[in-house]
Amino acid sequence: MSNERVLLIDSSTSVLRVGLAVSAGKIFAAENRDRFRHAEFIIGLIDRLLRENGVAKRELNGIIVSTGPGSFTGLRVGLATAKGLAQALKIPVAGVSTFEAASPRLYRTVGSAAVLIRSRREQFYSGLIDSPQFDSRMIELIDISEITSRFPGIPLLPVDMPDFPSIPGLRLIRPEEFTLEHEDFLALGRERLIGTGHDSLASLEPLYIQQFPAGRINE
């Protein structure tokens, strides 16, 4: 598969983001910051991105979509849109989790770090990034009271949480140090699309996480 003209859909956070990789190193992006109103804007945002950059839907070669974890409704909107386009255009689609997307550049930039994504008010999806690759099966659901003991001395990256509180003894990674970008999803997703890592439409689902007695998660 060509890695040109690949569409990205990330609806896992409060910000709806779409991206378009037209060639190596040439990426266009668009966002909508009307918090969690993704269903209203996703089709229009994709259409505008393609139109402004002279790409017709029929020219797309693949789709990359965020599988989260994150907003339940937002993820369903993004996955449904990606699947519908992939089926209509007969092109492959690859799901990439937020943890997987962040890992390569975050590890190069900061070293070992913990990523946190809000689940409920005081619960978080968490994962330790200690290499450029991350296995999404290692995500855990933890309470805010557990963060210090789980990640002692390890920098924390709260995703889409500008109000995340300071925790004594732990360092928060500042936005100027690292912010998750469209390119992070596109880089990994394009690798999968070119290889054999694309997903079947039937099995591609958001990354749902349930807590079990040991704290480990099941997808």
Please tell me what each predicted stretch does:
Residues I46-G62, S149-I154:
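Phosphate/pyrophosphate-binding loops at sites that engage ATP/ADP/AMP, CoA/4′-phosphopantetheine
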Residues A21, R33, R51, V55-R58, ...:
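Recognition helices and adjacent regulatory flanks at domain boundaries
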Residues F41-G44, A80, G84, A101, ...:
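Short amphipathic alpha-helical face segments that pack within enzyme cores
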Residues F36-E40, F72-R76, L180:
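Short, conserved micro-motifs enriched in small and acidic residues
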Residues H38-N53, F99:
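Short, well-ordered amphipathic alpha-helical segments that serve as non-catalytic structural scaffolds
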Residues G62-T98:
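DPxDG-like acidic metal-binding loop motif
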Residues M1-I27, R33, R37, A94-E219:
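Oxyanion-binding and handling regions
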